[in-house]
Regions:
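Eukaryotic intrinsically disordered, low-complexity regulatory linkers and tails enriched in Ser/Thr/Pro
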Residues: 1-193
């Protein structure tokens, strides 16, 4: 399980070189015993329950990516707000969507990665201001925001991701290093399979 391995400091190369470890989304949930935990969905169709709060998982992920967890910037250099899209790398740009009702100070926002080879389909939920997100072969994920708002958040994250990639490719083009371009091509090919 990638999220648990990250917490133990395992090498990040295992994530990049193995497409089955690419993340679709993190959903905050409660264990049957009542503890705060995170449900992780992966591109290869796996769902795993990690007995760690999402705050710890995203903090470890940011540290492994070489980022300062509390100071993740937007693609235009501004410090991002709590629910604005966050880019951890060319393979991870998360949209924050409300996935559970608040209990104390527990995290209520799920993180949905827009840099995946799937399309998110948003449908009406069972109550007003709720929606279902359909992705891949997973069961529909209930979220506590209207379909219009969910689509807006996903589009906002996709725009952030496109801006990030555009700026990254501009910097690579300046380097004129064919090795860098080849490595990026291989990474993108693996991501889009």
């Amino acid at each position: 399980m990638m999220a648990a391995r990250l917490s133990k400091g395992e090498d990040l190369d295992l994530i990049y070189t193995n497409p089955k470890n690419h993340i679709v989304c993190f959903i905050p949930t409660y264990e049957p015993g009542g503890g705060d935990s995170t449900k992780c969905y992966f591109v290869d169709g796996r769902e795993e329950l990690v007995c760690l709060p999402m705050r710890i998982i995203t903090r470890e992920l940011a540290l492994q990516e070489g980022l300062r967890p509390n100071y993740i910037m937007t693609s235009d250099g501004r410090r991002s707000s709590y629910t604005s899209p966050k880019t951890y790398g060319p393979h991870l740009t998360f949209a924050h969507i409300k996935c559970r009702r608040p209990v104390g100070k527990d995290v209520v926002y799920g993180l949905f990665n827009v840099a995946i080879p799937y399309e998110y389909i948003v449908t009406e939920g069972p109550e007003p201001d709720t929606s279902y997100i359909h992705v891949g072969n997973f069961a529909p994920i209930l979220v506590y925001q209207s379909p219009r708002h969910v689509k807006h958040k996903l589009n906002e994250a996709m725009l952030e991701h496109c801006n990030y990639v555009r700026k990254m490719l501009a910097r690579i083009k300046l380097s004129q290093n064919p090795q860098v371009v080849a490595e990026l091509f291989i990474a993108w090919r693996d991501l889009t399979r």
